[in-house]
Curated annotation (Swiss-Prot):
The keyword Cell membrane does not apply. Keywords: Cytoplasm, DNA damage, DNA repair, Hydrolase. Pfam families: UDG (PF03167). One of its GO terms (biological process) is base-excision repair, AP site formation via deaminated base removal. GO terms for molecular function: uracil DNA N-glycosylase activity. GO terms for cellular component: cytoplasm. The gene is ung. The active site is at 65 (proton acceptor). The lineage of its organism: Bacteria, Bacillati, Bacillota, Bacilli, Lactobacillales. This is Uracil-DNA glycosylase.
Length: 229
């Protein structure tokens, strides 16, 4: 079988790649990328998986579908490429980080430093048509990302951070006897004041990792990401 992800995720998801729904999704995407503008760029679709191998995942921050503006999405939930303005939801995540763990603000939204430590930045849908939120829902991505969540749950000792209703709906896939689940409203400007601010997900994540005798996450991002492209 063709290699889609260049680490242990390939083996974990190989059964999914062989199923009819994935073949249909592949055909749909070929057509979409050929005829319209789709984000992220094709080579970035599986970036979250490439950055954080299966056996290294400690934390999952679950997003919905990718940012649908130009130059924003690069395959990782909430993250944007260097040089791109920090989107409103991520600004609110940074505000909560400041009050929760004393995060020093940065002027970029490139979250690779988290991914490198085992924070899996997964969207439930991995592509989107430009300017059309949710336009690639129900095409097969959910089945694939559900399989990824279920595999991590089975492996155990993962903190799942679920913000907003569509992320919370994935709770049913998670075995809470051997994993931890933290939920709050979505950090978008519309919802953040209704329970996102003050939810302390970052310090709670690290408390849980310490209980499992795992190294906590250093949530501080580097001030300069020009070197990390």
């Amino acid at each position: 079988m063709k290699t889609i992800i260049h680490n242990d995720w390939q083996t974990v998801l190989e059964p999914e790649f062989a199923k009819p729904y994935y073949g249909q999704l592949h055909q749909f995407l070929k057509q979409e990328y050929a005829t319209t503008t789709v984000y992220p760029e094709m080579h970035h679709i599986f970036q979250a998986f490439e950055w954080t191998p299966f056996e290294q995942v400690k934390v999952v921050i679950l997003g919905q579908d990718p940012y649908h503006g130009p130059h924003q999405a690069h395959g990782c939930s909430f993250s944007v490429l260097p040089g791109v303005k920090v989107p409103p939801s991520l600004k609110n995540i940074y505000k909560e980080l400041q009050t929760d763990v004393g995060f020093n603000p940065v002027n970029h939204g490139y979250l690779k430093a988290w991914a490198d430590q085992g924070v899996f930045l997964l969207n439930t849908v991995l592509t989107v048509r430009a300017g059309e939120a949710n336009s690639h829902r129900q095409q097969g991505w959910e089945q694939l990302t559900d399989a990824a969540i279920a595999a991590l749950s089975q492996r155990g000792h993962v903190v799942f951070i679920l913000w907003g209703n569509s992320a919370k709906a994935k709770r049913a896939l998670i075995d809470e006897s051997q994993n931890a689940v933290l939920t709050a409203v979505h950090p978008s400007p519309l919802a953040a004041y209704h329970g996102f601010f003050g939810s302390k997900p970052f310090s709670q994540t690290n408390q849980q990792l310490k209980q499992w005798a795992m190294t906590p996450i250093n949530w501080q991002l580097p001030q300069d990401v020009s070197e990390q492209k």
